[in-house]
């Protein structure tokens, strides 16, 4: 590959002859590969790799693969056998002058030799049939092309076209600023401005391959990055030409839309090509924060960068929440408002009398609005401190008296009790919830009914009277009082005895041995 020190020797005769011989060898290789690819295109399409196209068995394999339905088309004028676009920027810039001289000398000869390429491209892009003759002199040696260039050419171009359709246009000030900063680097190529209309796909392809080789082989990255930037800068002014070419290749975009997903799974390869140039500049513009955009959208300031406080941070009182806390619902009906206030006051422990006075129940709920009803309400509505004393041990008697008073007043009449229950429905529910626990405690503390001493249950019980229904039933079946049960009187004459042990003693306590005082003329169970 040519280095920077080879430039002074270009003007000499030895340098020119050596350069001419090397370039002729390249041209021979190019013609051979072009003939192979043109014959293969007539059978099934372009070859995927330039290195495999030299073998005779590879075209047969590729033709068999094309028959399965995968349609391969190249978006670019340059084909996979044109491998000079993968070189670094240092080698590329060092060969621009001899390549230009060679193009000026042998332009007619190369036009004659590139007829096969022109015939191969006339079906797809008719105006670019003479592009191969003007660009072929820029290619370099065959040993520069490696596997990355040969295998990744068409995939990246397909992906470039698809992402290009989704690219976001840059603002005018940002694009103009980047263009002004890019002009000094491209001044050395001003003599090639006439060929840019036909050579912009070459720069795009060169940029893709250089970026892919950068991710694969470890080498000096500064020159490669510079080369990529320069390629982007060269292709920036040709945006209108690219859009024109893209409209002409719209049918190719439709045919390749199904195969574009194959290139999206290439791991570890970042294709910063012309199609994604708008996205890259957009992200740079957002990173530089020139217009203050949010997520790449101009004119939208994100909420975390706003100077004024947000609405959530002002701590303004919410009228709905305040109305819920205070219990004042302007849209609620009067009965619903009173019921809510009653439940709220009951939760806070407010007496029921105050509840009724503050809530203002409607007249429809008071069926008997008289002094008697109000009197009953006062009697059945204990105040807060009395409620606190209910559960104290010294107030059992007072609580029992209140309980009896409520029971007696409830039994005075059906109508009056119904009106009382209707008027004091909330009060009754409140009293019931308060008295339930105390009643359970009182029942648990009361002594159990029955004899507390040990002995036989019902030992001193009176005999069953003859008017008892059980006694008369047994006599109707043939039983006579004083005899045993059964037809012959041989059954039991006394009821089954039940012995009660003292409290706290289990089964080991000895049973009392006592006999009944009377001959037990009874036949039924003791009462």
Curated annotation (Swiss-Prot):
The keyword Transport does not apply. One of its GO terms (molecular function) is nucleic acid binding. Its main location: nucleus. GO terms for cellular component: nuclear speck; nucleolus. InterPro entries: G_patch_dom, Splicing_assoc_domain. Residues 510-527 have a biased composition (Low complexity). Residues 97-116, 186-196, 231-257 have a biased composition (Basic and acidic residues). Residues 466-512 form the G-patch domain. Residues 62-76, 206-215 have a biased composition (Basic residues). Pfam families: G-patch (PF01585). The keyword Lipid metabolism does not apply. The modification Phosphoserine is found at residues 114, 116, 145. It is found in: Nucleus speckle; Nucleus, Nucleolus. It comes from the Eukaryota. Keywords: Nucleus, Phosphoprotein. Residues 35-135, 175-281, 350-375, 480-527 are annotated as: Disordered. Interacts with DHX15. Enhances the ATPase activity of DHX15 in vitro. This is G patch domain-containing protein 2. It comes from Mus musculus (Mouse). The lineage of its organism: Eukaryota, Metazoa, Chordata, Craniata, Vertebrata. The gene is Gpatch2.
């Amino acid at each position: 590959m040519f280095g920077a020190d080879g430039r002074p020797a270009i003007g000499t005769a030895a340098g020119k002859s050596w350069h001419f011989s090397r370039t002729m060898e390249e041209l021979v290789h190019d013609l051979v590969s072009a003939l192979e690819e043109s014959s293969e295109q007539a059978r099934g399409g372009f070859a995927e790799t330039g290195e495999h196209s030299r073998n005779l068995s590879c075209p047969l394999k590729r033709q068999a693969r094309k028959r399965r339905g995968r349609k391969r088309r190249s978006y670019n004028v340059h084909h996979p056998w044109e491998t000079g676009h993968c070189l670094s920027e240092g080698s590329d810039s060092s060969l621009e002058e001899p390549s230009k001289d060679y193009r000026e000398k042998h332009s007619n000869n190369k036009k004659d030799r590139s007829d096969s390429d022109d015939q191969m491209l006339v079906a797809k892009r008719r105006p670019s049939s003479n592009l191969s003759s003007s660009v072929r002199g820029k290619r370099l040696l065959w040993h520069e092309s490696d596997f990355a260039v040969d295998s990744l050419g068409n995939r990246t171009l397909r992906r470039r076209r698809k992402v290009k359709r989704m690219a976001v246009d840059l603002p005018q000030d940002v694009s103009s600023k980047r263009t002004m900063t890019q002009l000094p680097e491209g001044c050395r190529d001003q003599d090639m401005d006439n060929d840019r209309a036909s050579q912009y796909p070459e720069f795009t392809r060169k940029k893709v391959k250089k970026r892919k080789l950068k991710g694969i082989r470890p080498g000096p990255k500064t020159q490669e990055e510079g080369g990529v930037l320069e390629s982007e800068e060269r292709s920036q002014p040709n945006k209108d030409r690219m859009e024109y070419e893209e409209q002409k290749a719209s049918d190719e975009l439709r045919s390749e839309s199904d195969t574009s997903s194959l290139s999206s799974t290439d791991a570890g390869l970042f294709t910063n090509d012309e199609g994604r140039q708008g996205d890259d500049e957009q992200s740079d513009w957002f990173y530089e924060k020139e217009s203050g955009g949010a997520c790449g959208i101009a004119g939208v300031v994100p909420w975390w960068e706003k100077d004024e406080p947000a609405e959530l941070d002002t701590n303004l009182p919410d009228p709905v929440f305040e109305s819920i806390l205070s219990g004042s619902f302007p849209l609620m009906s009067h009965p619903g408002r009173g019921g809510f206030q009653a439940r709220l006051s009951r939760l806070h422990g407010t007496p029921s009398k105050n509840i009724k006075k503050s809530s203002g129940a409607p007249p429809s709920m008071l069926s008997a609005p008289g002094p008697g009803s109000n009197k009953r309400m006062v009697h059945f509505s204990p105040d807060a401190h009395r409620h606190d004393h209910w559960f104290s041990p010294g107030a059992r008697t007072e609580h029992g008296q209140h309980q009896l008073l409520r029971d007696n007043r409830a039994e005075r009449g059906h109508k009056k009790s119904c009106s009382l229950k209707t008027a004091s429905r909330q009060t009754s529910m409140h009293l019931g919830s308060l008295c339930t626990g105390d009643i359970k405690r009182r029942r648990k503390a009361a002594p159990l009914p029955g004899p507390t001493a040990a002995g036989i249950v019902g030992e001193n019980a009176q005999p069953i009277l003859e008017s008892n229904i059980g006694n008369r039933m047994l006599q109707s079946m043939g039983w006579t009082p004083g005899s045993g049960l059964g037809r012959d009187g041989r059954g039991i004459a006394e009821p089954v005895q039940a012995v009660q042990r003292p409290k706290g003693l289990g089964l080991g306590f000895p049973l009392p041995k006592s006999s009944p005082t009377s001959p037990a003329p009874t036949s039924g169970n003791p009462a």
